[in-house]
Swiss-Prot record:
This is 3-epi-6-deoxocathasterone 23-monooxygenase CYP90D1. It comes from Arabidopsis thaliana. Involved in brassinosteroid (BR) biosynthesis. May convert teasterone (TE) to 3-dehydroteasterone (3DT, 3-DHT), or 6-deoxoteasterone (6-deoxoTE) to 3-dehydro-6-deoxoteasterone (6-deoxo3DT, 6-deoxo3DHT). It catalyses: 3-epi-6-deoxocathasterone + reduced [NADPH--hemoprotein reductase] + O2 = 6-deoxotyphasterol + oxidized [NADPH--hemoprotein reductase] + H2O + H(+); (22S,24R)-22-hydroxy-5alpha-ergostan-3-one + reduced [NADPH--hemoprotein reductase] + O2 = 3-dehydro-6-deoxoteasterone + oxidized [NADPH--hemoprotein reductase] + H2O + H(+). The gene is CYP90D1. It is a single-pass membrane protein.
Amino acid sequence: MDTSSSLLFFSFFFFIIIVIFNKINGLRSSPASKKKLNDHHVTSQSHGPKFPHGSLGWPVIGETIEFVSSAYSDRPESFMDKRRLMYGRVFKSHIFGTATIVSTDAEVNRAVLQSDSTAFVPFYPKTVRELMGKSSILLINGSLHRRFHGLVGSFLKSPLLKAQIVRDMHKFLSESMDLWSEDQPVLLQDVSKTVAFKVLAKALISVEKGEDLEELKREFENFISGLMSLPINFPGTQLHRSLQAKKNMVKQVERIIEGKIRKTKNKEEDDVIAKDVVDVLLKDSSEHLTHNLIANNMIDMMIPGHDSVPVLITLAVKFLSDSPAALNLLTEENMKLKSLKELTGEPLYWNDYLSLPFTQKVITETLRMGNVIIGVMRKAMKDVEIKGYVIPKGWCFLAYLRSVHLDKLYYESPYKFNPWRWQERDMNTSSFSPFGGGQRLCPGLDLARLETSVFLHHLVTRFRWIAEEDTIINFPTVHMKNKLPIWIKRI
């Protein structure tokens, strides 16, 4: 059995265990819910909104095996495409132990993602819920979520932070790129991950270097390893190790918070300029924003620095490496900006990077094709009717964004990397939602674009490179199989 077959077999075995475990713990539909399912089916046959067609698959495991098999292929959306042809763009299924309504319809997805918590709430696998905790920004609802999301979002969009991000990216990238060798490949995914984590750690809690950063990174690696682990918590299991790692990180962040409070005791609160997200949250008077809640959420917010941003950067370089015309135009655009700034003696500001039109089109097209976030899950809190479909109370809803982004209904030649398609196209449509949507739209989306813009600028203005052949792995998270090795030559 070759390596890929072994991996696939292990994945099947792994997820079947998860499904069986969920079944034992009552996550599988109860007899009462089965009756309700049948009631919905009968109702939809006679009048009113229809219950989506589809199949619940095999007993216990549902359609999980076929879903995982497709997820590991080079066309993960094939599972969805097959059912879309059979049942339509919205259909029922049963994956990972949960009865699920799956949508590949852009309008239905937008309607669900824009709904409030009376209709839909976030839904995550049991392991993720345990690791995040009930007070995570990913799970909380109502006024506390709006308050937290608003405070964090405003700061992440602020010109002050964007200027800091540019300075930090320049510093960390220069330190890294100065050490790159022409005699051995640079693992681009690892480099981008290291830089992005440093940038985010400073933006969140002002940890920049030294033992604090190294300790945080070590514990974070242990923590994030448990996100796709078995939901079994006892000494020796990955979930137990991950929970312990998070406890250690929370204690570290709480010490940082206590230090900040001590340093500002003798100052007027209004005179304290927020340098990071913790400062912003500490300045808020809400009694609900406890130090423990803040510390826990700082850990959760580090996940994009480990996954989303580095993957976006890596995929952009991968797609550009395979598209010489796009790479040449992006390089020309960035070299012109560099020459202009050298001529005037001005530094590069954050809005300089975001004003590069073709660079932004490349990032947008990378988001569409790369699908860093392949889908978003919600749970229906009541029966909800959308576009003629009824989504039953208690059912999971999966907005499968990847299928929408690669649908020829919305995009001509959807599997072709074509940044020029965005010259006349509006990004603010239901058919483009790489960061989710609604009240839970990722607050760091502007920073993701900015960090990618800065990275690409430094790369194309300092180096020429050849990328080795590599494969995009789409499950359980998007990443490059070999970390995208590139052979560089300095300009």
